[in-house]
Amino acid sequence: MAAKVASGTNKVFQNHDDVHISFEDQQRINRFAKHNARMDDFKAELETKRNELKSLEEALEEIELFDEDEDIPFLVGEVFLSHKLEKTQDMLKETKEQVLKEIAGVEAKAKVIKAEMDELKAHLYQRFGSNISLEAED
């Protein structure tokens, strides 16, 4: 690191254009970048799951209007199976509960990653100050 001593004093001024990056610092930067990419994946997955949840809730509302003895097609894998109203409602509720669990799981993973990212960000900003930018580019 380049340092300059002010004349007549013992103060040291550092030239911020010449910052030494240690191997450990590079590892932290790389880990932060990986976590940032994972967070983007989690955001996309959460959006997909929330849209799926919304569709399930709308389907539950719509089938309320059907007759009890009418067959209602329900998508299982790649095929539609027809069931009576009550059975279809039960299947939709089970699917909704599963999607809610999946959303909670993704949110929990994202929370852990976010905590580690915050820790890395604090360390890297302390070390490099304004010479590094770790903010998302939205």
From Swiss-Prot:
Pfam families, sorted: Prefoldin_2
Zinc-finger in keyword set: no
GO BP annotation list: protein folding
A GO term, aspect molecular function: unfolded protein binding
Entry keywords, A to Z: Chaperone
GO cellular component: cytoplasm; prefoldin complex
InterPro entries per record: PFD_beta-like, PFDN4, Prefoldin
Keyword Chaperone: yes
CDD domains membership: Prefoldin_4
Reported function: Binds specifically to cytosolic chaperonin (c-CPN) and transfers target proteins to it. Binds to nascent polypeptide chain and promotes folding in an environment in which there are many competing pathways for nonnative proteins.
Family assignment from sequence similarity: Belongs to the prefoldin subunit beta family.
Assembly notes: Heterohexamer of two PFD-alpha type and four PFD-beta type subunits.
Protein name: Probable prefoldin subunit 4
Source species of the chain: Drosophila melanogaster
